[in-house]
Curated annotation (Swiss-Prot):
Belongs to the 4Fe4S bacterial-type ferredoxin family. RnfC subfamily. One of its GO terms (cellular component) is plasma membrane. [4Fe-4S] cluster 1 binds at C377, C380, C383, C426. Residues 605-615 have a biased composition (Low complexity). It is found in: Cell inner membrane. This is Ion-translocating oxidoreductase complex subunit C. The keyword Translocase applies. It comes from Escherichia coli O157:H7. The complex is composed of six subunits: RsxA, RsxB, RsxC, RsxD, RsxE and RsxG. It comes from the Bacteria. [4Fe-4S] cluster 2 binds at C387, C416, C419, C422. Residues 602-652, 664-685, 695-714 are annotated as: Disordered. Pfam families: Complex1_51K, Fer4_7, RnfC_N, SLBB. Keywords: 4Fe-4S, Cell inner membrane, Cell membrane, Electron transport, Iron, Iron-sulfur, Membrane, Metal-binding, Repeat, Translocase, Transport.
Amino acid sequence: MLKLFSAFRKNKIWDFNGGIHPPEMKTQSNGTPLRQVPLAQRFVIPLKQHIGAEGELCVSVGDKVLRGQPLTRGRGKMLPVHAPTSGTVTAIAPHSTAHPSALAELSVIIDADGEDCWIPRDGWADYRSRRREELIERIHQFGVAGLGGAGFPTGVKLQGGGDKIETLIINAAECEPYITADDRLMQDCAAQVVEGIRILAHILQPREILIGIEDNKPQAISMLRAVLADSHDISMRVIPTKYPSGGAKQLTYILTGKQVPHGGRSSDIGVLMQNVGTAYAVKRAVIDGEPITERVVTLTGEAIARPGNVWARLGTPVRHLLNDAGFCPSADQMVIMGGPLMGFTLPWLDVPVVKITNCLLAPSANELGEPQEEQSCIRCSACADACPADLLPQQLYWFSKGQQHDKATTHNIADCIECGACAWVCPSNIPLVQYFRQEKAEIAAIRQEEKRAAEAKARFEARLARLEREKAARLERHKSAAVQPAAKDKDAIAAALARVKEKQAQATQPIVIKAGERPDNSAIIAAREARKAQARAKQAELQQTNDAATVTDPRKTAVEAAIARAKARKLEQQQANAEPEQQVDPRKAAVEAAIARAKARKLEQQQANAEPEQQVDPRKAAVEAAIARAKARKLEQQQANAEPEEPVDPRKAAVEAAITRAKARKLEQQQANAEPEEQVDPRKAAVAAAIARAKARKLEQQQANAEPEEQVDPRKAAVAAAIARVQAKKAVQQKVVNED
């Protein structure tokens, strides 16, 4: 008896509220076996054919590709796509895709070469020896996604289930009218489907495995039973035909009696569901080593001459499939991708087949009937009775039209599975599903904007916090920098204060003068002299700085010196001519001549010291020196002629001659030292030196002949001349040492 009750409970099924029974229209396409379609000339492969972000491109225009070669890399939830055939990548550009609005998405366009060559395939026949993580990664990298219509990456779904999955459900209900892709796949490939189910079971290790299939598929049921005859780990449950019993939440409740909580997932109650087509794709990926490059697509409708189910390559244009099936379009012909309740009308036929394409319906005008005009809601509640999710479609309709997003969210619009049962039974012909889709899209956009605002607010608050931290750290640094001075600084400050106090005490000390004593002002006098000396030193430094800063031309300086000497001689001549009878003191004249010569020498010295680095032409300098000596001798002769009666001291004359010779030698030395690098003609230098010596001797002779009548002791004159020469040489040497 207990076994009977256990068996009864084991095979028990539950029924959900709502649902409808539309015409099935499945016999048009489920009677013929699966067949291949000739390759198209061009394939368009969108990078995003699943829920999640598109993968990273790994091919470029002009690349040769083989069938099964990855076109993108799959990282995280990004699912890769693969080449459906061999050929050449001709473009990577946006292209209209399978979407109600025909949105353009980035796609890889391949021109087929007709050879249809595969990449090297490496199958894992002994998949049981592989680790769970390896199998999940292989399924993910081979591009397997949910082929029942959702398109969720299978590898991510298996990874998220983890160890908490107790029941694995294989969805074979296929409840929507016209669609027979899963039915035909189970009839023709039942063994491969079961093998895929075993791979999923090996990964998840569930406690039970259930196959849910509607009772309107007798051939598929018989094929599965034949394959599962010797299996005791997989149970097949045949359920009554009712739309939408193929929904994930509805089928879960039918087979287990468990309800998925609002806003939750089936994994929350220990259930994971996979489609029949997904199980077949898992088998091909793991055992055969073939990425998903094709899927079964139902071609049906009265506008198609040869309806049936075909193996359609992903990326094949819809027009190519329809033309191969004998498509006979009428005026205003529509083509629906998907079923009549959950599908959408294609804006044109150049869109490609993708992973979630399970049916192409081309109905005639008789099948669809005349279009009905939308009318006002009469609140009949027929939609609420038909809703399989236990929602209130009429309330959601009003909230959607009134943009009352909060109320729509409160009434669980997110739980709507968009099955279309409410719109099917609506007597006012209101396209309720369209309103619900639009409302859910608007709510998603609002939440996305709120998320961005929250992230921006978080960034702003983080920035404010960072600025506050930086400000606090800056203030702390200022406080630490404003601490008391160090010990040595304190000592220096104390010493300065002591000196100031001492000076103030000395300044305020009264001066006491005792009777009979003179005040001692020596300190004051010494301080005054020190200040004067300091002022003179500063003045001298300033004068030296100004002299050093003044850059003059040596030739101009020589000219100025010559002009000064000429003016001195002219003044002496004027004085001599103006008063010939006037007795001139010879000593004063000699003093004035000496002063003039001293000024000339000083000017020459300043010229030599002003620019020692300046490059001077030695020949020009020699000429100027000779001119200066000649002018000096001429001035002496004029002085001698102006006062013939004046007796001349021979010793003075000898001294002057020696000084003149010394000047000549010094000038020659300065010229030689000024440019040691300059190449000078030795013959010219010797000639110039000889001329200078000859002029000096001539001057001595003139001085000697000026007063022949004067009796001069020759011995005294010789001694005086020798002494003068020695003194002149000594003076020149001392001057050279000082200048060095």
